[in-house]
Amino acid sequence: MTRRLVVLRHAKSAYPPGVLDHDRPLAPRGVADARAAGEWVRDHVGAPDHVVVSSARRTRGTWTLAAGAIGYIGAAGYDAASPGPLTIDPRVYDASAATLVEVLRELPERVGTALLVGHNPGCEDLVARLAAARDPDAARLLAVKYPTSGIAVLDVHVAWAELGAGTATLRRFAVPRG
């Protein structure tokens, strides 16, 4: 079974004075871009089976807006307060690619499509580590930059527990804007 991993970098955040990095909210542009990212996922991937989100305010905000656009909120089993289809994981905040791989290895095997909402450089480094092969157009876009609201779609060729370097193929890379 080929699995799919969608790696979404959080939308553009604001920099209010006196606010810790972890607690920064989305900027107005980020609000629009997060919705656009959700629409892109809905139209090109579909609703994920499981979502892993950093505990940072901007990633949680990105997912909430994207989920609404996908139509994921209200789906059976969705409850932000309980484990299951949504995991808010503090390890994703400021994570290296190696840490993100560890987090993703914990996904249940029944998950066909997983979506990770995280930060750079972790998102970019994760995609580079996992993707043994790359669609040329996607690779060209990703080589330039992994901007806020950037979305990488990878086909994973192993069980989640076996995820590692070279175990996926980068299929698409997009940067939806609202």
Locate predicted features.
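Active-site-proximal alpha-helix that buttresses catalytic centers in soluble enzyme cores
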Residues: 2-91, 95
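Residue-level preference for the first positions of well-ordered beta-strands
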Residues: 5, 113-115, 151
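Short, glycine/charged-enriched secondary-structure capping and boundary segments
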Residues: 20-23, 65-69, 101-104, 129-132, ...
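Glycine-rich phosphate-binding loop signature in dinucleotide/nucleotide-binding domains
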Residues: 44-47, 107-111
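Alpha-helix N-cap/helix-start capping motif
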Residues: 56-57, 120-121, 148
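Short phosphate-binding loop-to-helix
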Residues: 91-109
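A glycine-rich beta-strand to alpha-helix segment
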Residues: 112-133, 139
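Domain-level recognition of soluble alpha/beta enzyme cores
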Residues: 134-169, 175
